[in-house]
Swiss-Prot record:
Keyword Nucleotide-binding: no
Main subcellular location of this protein, as a coarse class: virion
Pfam families in UniProt: Flu_PB2_1st, Flu_PB2_2nd, Flu_PB2_3rd, Flu_PB2_4th, Flu_PB2_5th, Flu_PB2_6th, Flu_PB2_7th
Molecular-function annotations in GO: RNA binding; RNA-directed RNA polymerase activity
Name of this chain's protein: Polymerase basic protein 2
Length: 770
């Protein structure tokens, strides 16, 4: 149907007789009937597309120069029609036209393509540099798992990503950035620079940025590696009866944020559980924790998953968590049923009576431990049935033991032979169920001997399992192994849970789904830098981490600390930050180091020779009560040793791997990390009169007054009452009269005034001398 035909039809319709004929004549073209007489949603779009693609010319060309470049035919193959299409008012073309265009079509300006389509070019780079191994044929056990479809630059929630994309592409229209957006300012700046001047439409840029920032996860059947670098090539790597060995090339994009987030959350929980109010402390530390440059809360909101520790901190911060339950390494998701808890006194196998919360009711769960998955059916104090799949022996064994303990089966209680007095990392006694869990994971034979055996089912796809985790013609009672695949259970739904003071997560039904005892005790090194901006957390770190955190804190509070020191306030040494630092000083040496460090600092103040780097270096050592020699003199040291040996020491008169200073550049290097002192070392170090450079709380009121007596020292000034006056030597020994303020003035104001006066004096002296 062309436009010319439509014009003819319009002319015909003006004639009443012709109109009647047209109305009564049937339309015999199915396509026309289909196109103009139905408005329903296609029920089977896939079939419709396949049917359409079978026709000779299924694709429409838009009008324009580009379409005109495609010839009618190429080497005897017809590429497009001459006829005009009624729907698009263009021409229709064949599938071969696409191939012709890709092969012989014009090449436009490709400048900026690599920057815009960076994720695709990185994928090509990984593919170009990949290592391909042999293909093996045979049964492939693929398990449906929730996997990330492609590697990301930085994962964030969709709403946060849309704000970041707006900030990158349309900074003027985006308005004032939210705090959650501003966290990613380095990424925003980098992307703006990269995309500057590209002629590609913003909608394409936005789509590509979304691909780099928003995670797309699907449940896919997978055998082997599940990282995004493998999943993007999954279609080439495995089928139902074949597998291809493959290792992606280039730098593997590991999710460092996720790993560092887990390390941080585990440490926060370990530190919090020893506090009088674990929840309060966990929230305080979590809100002051930064991973790289991003707050921990932002990471927890952006990154899907993590482990138990992450979910506990999420709940503490008021974020939603995935629907799942934990019991140590065992992860569970309820299929059916519900239990009710009642406290009962249970006589266990070692003759002791334990008060334990017993769950009553028939329940069914999906269970998982490592790579071993299964289905558990339990009732009150009985494990009815456990169906598991084949996996590593260690995972199978742990899953079976944990399910037996979780089911609270009477045989499990009777299997206890030794003492149950396990402690957590904080030195606290574990609750009875976690005691039993630890006991049987260490002494599995006690449990299996008590459990008993039976004949396995006769079904061909099932087999028995013995205490050595081998296939057997007898099986542990109620435990069966299936040859079929048990899919990984999905936990896509999120829910809001309440959290107790002791960091236990409770559902609305009152069911405890996980707690601090379920957090893994494995310790690993974070891939990204974690900063805990609270001294309460520092003692959990290594010696180097504690040194770095302490000196960072001193630099941050340098003005206040220096002012207190110059005013002779001895209680200034009693900061929480220094209490944490004391934990890495050998106990026998803490008092001696304190006496030495205090004596050096006092000498600096008395002799009016301020050295800021030395002040920073020695200040943390002053926390402990000072210990002196019998004659009242301090001990002398050239090197201050810290716990851990090796490079863990600080040189008093020179630099060391932990602490060094370059006076030319005014840069401190703490544990390899450079920190500038520019702007923090004022003129007091360049002038003789160090002590009088800062007069916090005093006002210079005039010239020397002989009626007020001799010049006062800093210590004597401190004893003056508000409004009292005194003589003092300022700057280069200039005699002046000062008055103590009646209200306490801001330290920073007095310090800045002191420095300003000092500069003016030095300048005037220079003018006078010239």
């Amino acid at each position: 149907m062309t436009l010319a035909k439509i014009e003819l039809l319009k002319q015909l319709l003006r004639d009443n007789e012709a109109k009647t004929v047209l109305k009564q004549t049937t339309v015999d073209q199915y396509n026309i009937i289909r196109k103009f007489n139905t408005s329903r949603i296609e029920r089977n779009p896939s079939l419709r597309m396949k049917w359409a693609m079978c026709s000779n010319f299924p694709l429409a060309l838009t009008k324009g120069d580009m379409a005109n470049r495609i010839p009618l035919e190429y080497k005897g193959i017809q590429l497009k029609t001459n006829a005009e299409d009624i729907g698009t008012k263009g021409q229709m073309c064949s599938i071969a036209a696409v191939t012709w265009w890709n092969t012989y079509g014009p090449i436009g300006d490709t400048e900026g393509f690599e920057k815009v389509y960076e994720s695709f070019f990185l994928r090509k780079m990984r593919l170009d540099n990949a290592t391909w191994g042999r293909i093996t044929f045979g049964p492939v056990e693929r398990v449906r798992k929730r996997v990330l479809l492609n590697p990301l630059t930085k994962e964030m929630p969709p709403d946060e990503a849309s704000n970041v994309i707006m900030e990158i592409l349309f900074p003027k229209e985006a308005g004032i950035p939210r705090e959650s957006t501003w966290i990613h300012r380095e990424l925003i700046k980098e992307k703006r620079e990269k995309l500057k001047g590209t002629m590609i439409t913003p909608i394409v840029l936005a789509y590509m940025l979304e691909r780099e920032l928003v995670a797309r996860r699907r449940f896919l059947p997978v055998a082997g590696a599940t990282s995004a670098e493998f999943i993007e090539m999954l279609h080439c790597l495995q089928g139902e009866n074949w597998r291809q060995i493959y290792h992606p090339g280039g730098n593997k994009l590991t999710e460092s944020r996720s790993q560092s987030m887990i390390v941080a959350c585990r440490k926060i929980i370990r530190r919090s559980i020893v506090a009088s109010n674990p929840l309060e402390l966990a929230v305080e530390i979590a809100n002051k924790t930064v991973i790289d440059t991003e707050p921990l809360k932002s990471c927890l909101a952006a990154i899907d998953g993590g482990d138990v520790a992450c979910d506990i901190i999420r709940a503490a911060l008021g974020l939603k968590i995935r629907q799942r339950q934990r019991f140590g390494r065992l992860e569970l998701k309820r299929i059916s049923g519900r239990g009710f808890k009642n406290d009962e006194e249970i006589l266990i196998g070692n003759g002791t009576i334990q008060k334990i919360g017993i769950w009553d009711g028939e329940e069914e769960f999906h269970v998982r431990c490592g790579e071993c998955r299964g289905i558990l059916k339990k009732s009150k104090m009985r494990m009815e049935k456990l169906l598991i799949n084949s996996a590593k022996k260690e995972d199978m064994k742990d899953l079976i033991i944990l399910c037996m303990v979780f089911s609270q089966d009477t045989r499990m209680f009777q299997g206890v032979r030794g003492e149950i007095n396990f402690l957590n990392r904080a030195g606290q006694l574990l609750s009875p169920m976690y005691q039993l869990q630890r006991y049987f994971l260490n002494r599995s034979n006690d449990l299996f001997d008590q459990w008993g055996y039976e004949e396995p089912p006769k079904a061909s796809e099932l087999h028995g399992i013995n205490e050595l985790m081998n296939a057997s013609d007898y099986t542990l009672k109620g435990v069966v192994v299936t040859k079929n695949v048990i899919d990984d259970f999905s936990s896509t739904e999120t829910e809001k849970v309440s959290i107790t003071k002791n960091l236990s997560l409770i559902k609305r039904t009152g069911e405890v789904i996980m707690g601090a005892n379920d957090v893994s005790e494995l310790e690993s090194q974070a891939q990204l830098m974690i900063t805990y901006d609270t001294p309460k957390m520092w003692e959990m770190g290594t010696t180097k981490e504690l040194v770095q955190n302490t000196y960072q804190w001193v630099l941050k509070n340098l003005v206040t600390l220096k002012a207190q020191f110059l005013l002779g306030k001895e209680d200034m040494f009693q900061w929480d930050a220094f209490e944490a630092f004391e934990s890495i000083i050998p106990q026998k040496m803490a008092g001696q180091y304190s006496g030495f460090a205090r004596a050096v600092l006092k000498q600096m103040r008395d002799q009016e020779v301020m050295k800021t780097d030395q002040f920073i270096k020695l200040l943390p050592f002053c926390f402990s009560p000072p210990k002196l020699r019998r004659n009242g003199e301090p001990y002398q040291f050239l090197r201050l040793m810290l716990k851990g040996g090796g490079e863990n020491f600080i040189e008093v008169r020179k630099g060391s791997p932990l602490f060094s200073y370059n006076p030319q550049t005014e840069v401190l290097t703490i544990c390899g990390r450079m920190m500038s002192l520019k702007g923090k070392i004022e003129d007091e170090e360049r002038n003789r009169s160090m002590g009088n450079a800062v007069l916090a709380g005093f006002l210079v009121s005039g010239k020397y007054d002989p009626d007020l007596g001799d010049f006062k020292t800093i210590e004597e000034l401190e004893k003056l009452k508000p409004g009292e006056k005194a003589n003092i030597l300022l700057y280069q020994g200039k005699p002046v009269k000062v008055v103590k303020r009646k209200r306490y003035s801001a330290l920073s104001n007095d310090i800045s005034q002191g420095i300003k006066r000092q500069r003016m004096t030095v300048e005037s002296m220079g003018w006078a001398l010239s």
